[in-house]
UniProtKB/Swiss-Prot annotation:
The active site is at C2 (nucleophile), K585 (for fru-6p isomerization activity). This is Glutamine--fructose-6-phosphate aminotransferase [isomerizing]. InterPro entries: GATase_2_dom (IPR017932), GFAT (IPR005855), GFAT_N (IPR047084), GlmS/AgaS_SIS (IPR035466), GlmS/FrlB_SIS (IPR035490), Ntn_hydrolases_N (IPR029055), SIS_dom (IPR001347), SIS_dom_sf (IPR046348). The lineage of its organism: Archaea, Thermoproteota, Thermoprotei, Sulfolobales, Sulfolobaceae. It comes from the Archaea. It comes from Sulfolobus acidocaldarius (strain ATCC 33909 / DSM 639 / JCM 8929 / NBRC 15157 / NCIMB 11770).
Length: 590
């Protein structure tokens, strides 16, 4: 969940500090509590760090005044040790000549720390990361050169990591990766390495993805990588040119990334559908696997789980043996050799999902992945890879990536049923029409719901996953407690909480309208205030109803309405929906 950036330049320059600052700001969406920067020149290694926001730390520590030919930057999300100045990265060794930044969890850090302490090493933080510079120092004391010392240090670590290290006297950045994202940007007389592409997108579009178990170093003009067995890697076919631009990763006049990304949903749908249609051979191979599999297990976390639940319900309606699985509960499930796993993740780096996939692969299952990031860890673990084309999503709360997950899964389902998939060409215009026509109403509902302390979100059939996602969104960004459940379960307990003014949000996709109407009437009889989002058929018993007429893709259209409601509830409370407290965009620790 930490953000990482490293820059190595051919000349010593304060302008590199400005690039690091810019990169750190682009990494803020990952969630963090402290910030730090290291610079290296011919004379010294300097570290400045503190608890706080990027702006606060940059100003307080005068980071823009730092100079050097190598820089490291880090935004920390606390896992080992509280968020403090001394726990912020980078961490250094006893001599102050080695600096390290790290994302991940070192499982054997306590044993290594104790061993290093017996050798005389002094630690100044509570973090697991700090053992790494001390390990490098210890191996160099024993006569190893810098790279050998780094390699041996990495080999002693158990757990997950994306590590960058600099050593005084070395004009290169050392790196290692296991389970956490790390990508290289190739510039002119300057190279970059970061946890996310947007960190260096202003300076280069040429990237090189580092695979699990690899380590190496970058200089101003060279990249060296060796695999987990120590063999040099041929990089000739690794370099890719990405088609994102800087504007795509900026707010473009919107007050927040979240609302910008909701409005980008139509374009994301269009790009994703174009990609799916151009790759029908892959889709048909996946469908053949689905038909021949004994079970189809759809795995995801958070928003991705809700998309997976929607897909699993569709497959169950076709008589297929399918069920959804929350990624973090993977240890309760044993895969079989004829199982097909659908793994869904926006980032492709969610650790509990990766652990689930690796376990199921070992048990003989085949993996289909759906992700927004090309060559992500999840994609590399998969037999079949489907890429959404949502573009970068900066806001922590998933919006357009949920929509592109749904459109991708609906496309596969339609292809499975041999429906005409040309209808998907119109999905973008339908969602665009819904956003423009209902945003004002969604704003009013959001403002009302922002004043509530608890809300029920109700759905039946295919509306249930949408209700669950709507409840999650308003919890995430507006800090309002919301519970989603099948509307038919109301009399089995939940209705006991309903009294005068209690808000319910009923999701009606037009399939099971009559039964849902009865549930709304029951709630209103106990004093509830009913808000209804309907597609194609009205409930007409609500206090407030947003009605979407002539809708071909109710899941998409209803979802953007629920996202708008959550966004305006957040803004109404004066909150920043892009950075919900205690949350991060990508969960890469257990």
């Amino acid at each position: 969940m930490c953000g990482i950036i490293g820059i190595v330049s051919s000349k010593e320059d304060k302008k590199i500090a400005d690039k690091v600052i810019s990169a750190l700001k682009r990494l803020e969406y990952r969630g963090y509590d402290s910030v730090g920067v290291a610079s290296l020149d011919n004379n010294k290694l300097e570290v400045r760090k503190a608890k706080g926001t990027v702006e606060e730390v940059i100003s307080k520590k005068k980071v823009s005044e730092m100079s050097g030919y190598i820089f490291l930057g880090h935004t920390r999300w606390a896992t080992h040790g509280p968020p403090t100045d001394y726990n912020a990265h980078p961490h250094v060794d006893c001599s102050g000549k080695i600096a390290v930044i790290h994302n991940g969890t070192i499982k054997n850090y306590k044993e290594l720390r104790e061993e290093l302490q017996t050798l005389g090493h002094v630690f100044k933080s509570d973090t697991d990361t700090e053992i790494i510079p001390h390990l490098i120092e210890e191996f160099m004391k024993r006569g190893m050169d810098a790279y050998s010392a780094f390699r041996n240090s990495i080999k002693t670590l158990e757990g997950s990591y994306a590590v960058l290290a600099v050593i005084h006297g070395e004009k290169r950045i050392f790196f290692a990766k296991r389970d956490n994202p790390l990508v290289i940007g190739l510039g002119e007389k300057e190279n970059y390495i970061a946890s996310d592409i947007p960190a260096f997108l202003s300076y280069t579009k040429r990237i090189l993805v580092i695979k699990d178990g690899e380590l190496g170093f970058i200089t101003t003009s060279n990249v060296f990588i060796e695999d987990k067995d120590g063999n040099p890697v041929d990089l000739s076919d690794r370099v890719r040119v990405i088609d994102w631009d800087v504007e795509t990763a900026s707010k473009e006049g919107y007050p927040h990334f979240m609302i910008k990304e909701i409005h980008e949903s139509p374009k994301s749908i269009r790009d994703t559908v174009d990609s799916l249609i151009s790759d029908l051979d892959l889709i048909d191979k996946i469908i053949a696997e689905m038909k021949s599999s004994g079970r189809i297990v759809v795995v995801g976390a958070g928003t991705s789980y809700h998309a997976g639940l929607y897909f699993s319900l569709l497959l169950s309606r076709e008589g297929m043996n399918s069920f959804p699985l929350i990624a973090s509960e993977y240890y309760n499930f044993k895969a079989k050799k004829d199982d097909l796993i659908f793994a869904i993740s926006q980032s492709g780096e969610t650790l509990d999902l990766l652990q689930a996939v690796r376990k199921f692969k070992e048990e003989g299952a085949r993996i289909v992945s759906l992700t927004n990031v090309i060559e992500s860890a999840l994609a590399r673990e998969s037999n079949y890879k489907i890429y959404m084309r949502a573009g970068p999503e900066i806001s922590v709360a998933a919006t357009k990536t949920f929509i592109t997950q749904l459109i991708s899964l609906l496309f596969i389902y339609s292809r499975l049923r041999r429906d005409n998939t040309n209808k998907f060409r119109g999905a973008d215009t339908e969602v665009e029409r819904v956003i423009s026509s209902v945003e004002g109403y969604a704003k009013l509902i959001g403002e009302e719901l922002s004043k509530k302390t608890s809300i029920y979100y109700l759905g039946r059939g295919m509306s249930l996953p949408l209700a669950m996602e709507g409840a999650l969104k308003i919890k995430e960004v507006a800090y309002v407690h919301a519970e989603a459940y099948p509307a038919g379960e109301s009399k089995h307990g939940p209705i006991s909480l309903v009294d005068k003014g209690f808000p319910i949000v009923a999701i009606n996709d037009g399939e099971i309208t009559d039964l849902l109407r009865n549930n709304v009437i029951e709630m209103k009889a106990r004093g509830a205030k009913a808000y209804v989002i309907s597609a194609n058929k009205k409930i007409s018993e609500s206090d407030v109803e947003i009605y979407l007429d002539s809708i071909q893709f109710p899941a998409l259209s209803i979802s953007v309405v629920l996202q708008l409601i959550a966004y305006y509830a957040s803004v109404s409370k004066g909150l920043n929906p892009d950075k919900p407290r205690n949350l991060a965009k990508t969960v890469t620790v257990e």
